[in-house]
């Protein structure tokens, strides 16, 4: 009846996820055949799939790539709805083997990303340009973020926070 609580167990088969990084979906509850789908019975579900490092060789384990970012948080301040602002982050491979940026995702439409190179040799660097769009900021809940998935076993998931708000 109403006001009672219960538990729902949701199982995720990671083998069936389409790619590394963020995957979001909704699970809808229904009590009766023909129940309508809506916000009242929606359970949003999200998962971040990371690379599996359990099969890497001893050689790879001793000589891993290592990512270094010039910043993991950007301060962009306030934007008008017709304004956009961009910042560039330098990504450097300070490790001993090739660094792969396997996936790059934004958590919402207020941000855009451009990456020059996805594979960096040891010692090499590249530029990641992050742009905030004022017209899409009003829809954003929380802090806009960029998700990066790499083959660095110590940093397979990097989240870059972008501190930006829309002017009222």
Segments from the language model and where they lie:
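Short, hydrophobic beta-strand segments
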Residues: 8-16, 128-136
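Surface-exposed binding patches on compact interaction domains or structured appendages
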Residues: 1-9, 96-125
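Ser/Thr/Gly/Pro-rich, low-complexity flexible regions
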Residues: 105, 115-118, 129-132, 157, ...
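Beta-strand-rich extracellular modules
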Residues: 13, 30-34, 133, 149-153
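Long, low-complexity ectodomains and other extracytoplasmic segments of secretory-pathway proteins
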Residues: 32-90, 94-95, 153-168
């Amino acid at each position: 009846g109403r006001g009672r609580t219960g538990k729902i167990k949701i199982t995720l088969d990671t083998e069936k996820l389409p790619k590394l990084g963020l995957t979001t979906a909704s699970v809808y509850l229904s009590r009766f055949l023909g129940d309508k789908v809506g916000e009242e019975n929606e359970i949003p579900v999200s998962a971040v799939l990371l690379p599996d490092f359990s099969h890497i060789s001893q050689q790879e384990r001793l000589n891993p790539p290592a990512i270094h970012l010039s910043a993991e948080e950007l301060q962009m301040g306030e934007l008008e709805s017709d304004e956009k602002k961009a910042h560039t982050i330098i990504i450097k491979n300070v490790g001993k083997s090739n660094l792969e940026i396997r996936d790059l995702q934004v958590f919402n439409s207020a941000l855009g990303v451009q990456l020059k190179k996805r594979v960096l040799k040891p010692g090499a660097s590249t530029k990641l340009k992050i742009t905030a769009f004022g017209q899409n900021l009003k829809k954003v809940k929380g802090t806009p973020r960029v998700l990066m998935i790499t083959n660095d076993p110590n940093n397979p998931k990097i989240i870059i926070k972008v501190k930006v708000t829309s002017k009222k």
